[in-house]
């Protein structure tokens, strides 16, 4: 009698399906969801977000709510705007923390909120929006992009 080979255990991936108008149907692995214990300013009840990359809008990415997938915020790396940007000493480990700034797009142009960045802890899949106490950064840093009236 021959012994059976040892069972191979493969981890099961937990996947969520999100239906969005902007990006269509998105399949998201749980491990790619960032938990925001305090939500975002003005959206404290929303605690889970993903980052969506869309090659049509690079370098802009989208912070998309898992609970309300119709809600997404345009974000980008602040280092593309200011290479010397610093969200503070608590977040200086660039291997662990990734800051993103929320963009506001209007008919007058586009601005970035450098004063209240999103900081992603990529090791623990956590996120938070912080407020930098210094007056060094603006909530409406101009991007120099004029919004087109045609789409």
Explain the meaning of each model-derived region.
Residues 1-151:
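Hydrophobic N-terminal alpha-helices or hydrophobic patches in metabolic proteins across all domains
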